[in-house]
Amino acid sequence: MAEGAEHQQKLTEKDKAELPSTIRDLAETLGIPLIDCIIPCNFCGKFLNYLEACEFDYKKLSLIWKDYCVFACCRVCCGATATYEFNQFYEQTVLGRDIELASGLSIFDIDIRCQTCLAFLDIIEKLDCCGRGLPFHKVRNAWKGICRQCKHFYHDW
């Protein structure tokens, strides 16, 4: 066992750039169906089920490569990570369209993730938050809002 560990190659930044960043791309690279692609969560070690694998890609999250081992993030750990980051790295809150003043960018050009589940907000979700005057939070130098799924989960419509 120790001999095998000694010969493991370390990933360079160039290597990482060439590796798949989504589960769908990984499945295509391996030539297997997406449903057969089982990947452990980086945080809890549980293997993502098919629905979680689809959600991971839908949220536009990126695979984590450690040497040549791949990891993702399960649904529960996405929520836990979002909460941890919010509690530890919160910077500021703005309401609705004030995000454009705070960032200096148009709402169309601002990348925003859900503060609850880490999903990448689409333009309709961003405009909905602006129109309703909902808060946007700056956390770890990135903007967070609320996605349509979490908004309905918390009955905030």
Swiss-Prot record:
GO molecular function, one term: zinc ion binding
Keywords (A to Z) from UniProt: Activator, DNA-binding, Early protein, Host cytoplasm, Host nucleus, Host-virus interaction, Inhibition of host innate immune response by virus, Metal-binding, Modulation of host cell apoptosis by virus, Transcription, Transcription regulation, Viral immunoevasion, Zinc, Zinc-finger
Job of this protein: Plays a major role in the induction and maintenance of cellular transformation. E6 associates with host UBE3A/E6-AP ubiquitin-protein ligase and modulates its activity. Protects host keratinocytes from apoptosis by mediating the degradation of host BAK1. May also inhibit host immune response.
Subunit structure: Forms homodimers. Interacts with ubiquitin-protein ligase UBE3A/E6-AP; this interaction stimulates UBE3A ubiquitin activity. Interacts with host BAK1.
Subcellular location per the Swiss-Prot or TrEMBL entry: Host cytoplasm; Host nucleus
BP GO annotations: DNA-templated transcription; regulation of DNA-templated transcription; symbiont-mediated perturbation of host apoptosis; symbiont-mediated perturbation of host ubiquitin-like protein modification; symbiont-mediated suppression of host innate immune response; symbiont-mediated suppression of host type I interferon-mediated signaling pathway
InterPro entries given in the database record: E6, E6_sf
SUPFAM superfamilies to which the protein is assigned, alphabetical: E6 C-terminal domain-like
Name the UniProt record assigns to this protein: Protein E6
The family this protein is said to belong to: Belongs to the papillomaviridae E6 protein family.
Organism: Human papillomavirus type 5b
Segments forming unnamed zinc fingers: 41-77, 114-150
Matching Pfam families: E6
Gene Ontology CC, one term: host cell nucleus
